[in-house]
């Protein structure tokens, strides 16, 4: 979707339909109300400001509403911003629907499901295999449709499964290089590590954090679920403990959200693979939006760095 909002350049005019992802009220220094809107289409999202917002604007311009907007692409603090000139809610005769504005994984759900099944069939430890299969059966529909996050990486439909399948591909190659790695543990950790996000996140459209997600987080919720599922399946043994540890430690550090650091080899590798895939997804989509010789917008999740796309890439591929 090269003509989408994410690919527009500074100074370019915009006239089209967008979906409201977030709407936040603010007040200027002289007391005038305004709205900060996060607007999106299938290509990505952009921040927009609606100055002198009315009470009616606050009540109608809410998440999951489709709007027709005209404006101009500006830059603010290193990021693109849409200056709104006119705005209205979509009407039935506009023939647009919410699903038109959702980004999606580059793989279809059927292929993602097939890749997950292949990984489970490769497992040799019956306890680990039964646990993982039970979770896939319980959450298959959500796993294949949910995003992996609200922003930064894999924040699109089927992003959660695509993140997992991409990590499995990395894990498979690393197992060839380091055959001493316990493949069952690594694959299980990859598949299970973010399933807690199904309870942490609200869904595919205008994804936000649920109350459980805000209060507990996906890591503690998933650790608890592993224990409950093991009891239900009457599975005992060290495998259950290590799987809990893999989930608990996959963010790597306490300041990144893990109560304990990785203390087994497969846990360390899971953390690194997770980091690689998340960062490559962020960078890939940011670099896709620019031309060779240009810098990306500053990426908050990448230490607020702007990345350069080399000129010689223009003549490659």
Curated annotation (Swiss-Prot):
Residues 163-279 form the HD domain. One of its GO terms (molecular function) is 3'-5'-RNA exonuclease activity. Pfam families: HD, tRNA_anti-codon. This is 3'-5' exoribonuclease YhaM. InterPro entries: 3'-5'_exoribonuclease_YhaM, HD/PDEase_dom, HD_domain, NA-bd_OB-fold, NA-bd_OB_tRNA, YhaM_exoribonuc/phosphodiest. PANTHER family: 3'-5' EXORIBONUCLEASE YHAM. The keyword Nuclease applies. SMART domains: HDc (SM00471). CDD domains: HDc, YhaM_OBF_like. Residues 17-90 bind DNA. Its EC number is 3.1.-.-. It comes from Oceanobacillus iheyensis (strain DSM 14371 / CIP 107618 / JCM 11309 / KCTC 3954 / HTE831). Gene3D superfamilies: Hypothetical protein af1432, Nucleic acid-binding proteins.
């Amino acid at each position: 979707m090269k003509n989408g909002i994410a690919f527009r350049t500074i100074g370019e005019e915009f006239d089209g339909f967008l979906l409201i992802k977030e709407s936040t009220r603010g007040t200027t220094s002289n007391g005038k109300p305004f709205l900060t809107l996060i607007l999106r289409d299938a290509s990505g999202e952009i921040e927009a400001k609606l100055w002198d917002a009315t009470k009616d604007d606050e009540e109608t311009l809410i998440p999951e509403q489709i709007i027709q907007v005209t404006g101009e692409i500006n830059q603010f603090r290193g990021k693109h911003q849409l200056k709104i000139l006119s705005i209205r809610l979509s009407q039935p005769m506009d023939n647009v629907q919410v699903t038109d504005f959702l980004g999606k994984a580059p793989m279809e759900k059927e292929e993602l499901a097939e890749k997950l099944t292949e990984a489970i069939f490769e497992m040799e430890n019956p306890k680990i295999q039964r646990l993982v299969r039970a979770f896939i059966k319980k959450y298959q529909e959500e796993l294949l449709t949910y995003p992996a996050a609200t922003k930064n990486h894999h924040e699109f439909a089927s992003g959660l499964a695509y993140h997992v399948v991409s990590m499995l591909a990395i894990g498979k190659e690393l197992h060839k290089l380091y055959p001493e790695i316990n493949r069952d543990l690594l694959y299980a950790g990859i598949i299970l590590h973010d399933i807690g996000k199904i309870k942490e996140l609200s869904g595919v459209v205008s994804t936000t954090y649920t109350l459980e997600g805000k209060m507990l987080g996906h890591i503690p919720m998933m650790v608890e679920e592993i224990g409950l599922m093991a009891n239900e399946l009457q599975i005992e043994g060290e495998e259950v403990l290590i799987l809990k540890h893999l989930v608990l430690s996959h963010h790597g550090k306490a300041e990144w959200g893990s109560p304990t650091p990785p203390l087994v080899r497969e846990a360390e590798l899971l953390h690194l693979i997770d980091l690689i895939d998340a960062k490559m997804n962020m960078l890939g989509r940011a670099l896709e939006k620019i031309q060779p010789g240009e810098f990306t917008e500053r990426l908050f999740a990448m230490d607020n760095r702007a990345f350069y796309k080399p000129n010689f890439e223009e003549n490659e591929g």
